Amino acid sequence: MSRSSPEQLSRFLAEVHGRPKKGLSQNFLIDGNILRKILAVSCVQAGDWVLEIGPGFGALTEVLVNQGAHVVALEKDSMLEETLKQLPIHLEITDACKYPLSQLQDQGWQGKGRVVANLPYHITTPLLRKLFLEAPNQWKTVTVMIQDEVARRITAQPGGKEYGSLTIFLQFFVDVHYAFKVSPGCFLPKPQVASAVVHMTVKENFPLEEPLRTKFFSLTRAAFGQRRKLLANALKDLYPKERVFEALSQLHFSDKTRPETLSLDDYLKLFYLLSLPA
């Protein structure tokens, strides 16, 4: 019987695990059709190395294994260890936010791999930032199920209310695609919000290397720190307002420009101009 079976999951919860833990965002996927769609979107092939964060009962894990992937799974809940060990995977019972991604090599990880996961919703943003701050060259693709609201932020275009620093951060590293929405009824227990699957293809080359990359993200975080402010005011702690006005003018933006107006490319050009000697 498949691990996406509601009956099998309910029996496991009743006999072994107990109630799903809200503090770990435990909403277990029980829809086989959604699992197959995630697999198709992820482009996982036999022999691929795949990092799965928060495997839970192992429904998605099972699908990845059956595809022939080498799966490294990071699970925080020790109550799930024994059932996950029944699958042919590399399992770490650990806090994914604290796990050094360099340790993947200790599991036999070879070359560039993929991330495929139903991410715990309460730590989605820090996990996504960790993947690209700590090991941006480790991945070919990242396919994750996340809260629909976050998915729309990640895929937002300039000018919209959902567009922000997380959008800029991820689009710096990836080309991102909103794949499909997932209703609460596909989970046990049902979450109170809709979910969505997004697929990210990691760029071959990133616009900036360190230490400039860190400085660039400081600029974009400051820009969106107070969304209602004009961009020049939002950046006043980093750059004199007159310098920002001058740079905006060179990019054909007015002094009244707000943070959500600029694209990633615009922000990169602005950063370049503001980095020039005064």
From Swiss-Prot:
Amino-acid positions noted as binding S-adenosyl-L-methionine in the UniProt annotation, renumbered to this chain: N27, L29, G54, E75, D95, N118
EC number: 2.1.1.182
Localization per record: Cytoplasm
Catalysed reactions listed for this entry: adenosine(1518)/adenosine(1519) in 16S rRNA + 4 S-adenosyl-L-methionine = N(6)-dimethyladenosine(1518)/N(6)-dimethyladenosine(1519) in 16S rRNA + 4 S-adenosyl-L-homocysteine + 4 H(+)
Coiled-coil region(s): none
The family this protein is said to belong to: Belongs to the class I-like SAM-binding methyltransferase superfamily. rRNA adenine N(6)-methyltransferase family. RsmA subfamily.
HAMAP family per record: 16SrRNA_methyltr_A (MF_00607)
Protein name, as recorded: Ribosomal RNA small subunit methyltransferase A
Chain's gene name: rsmA
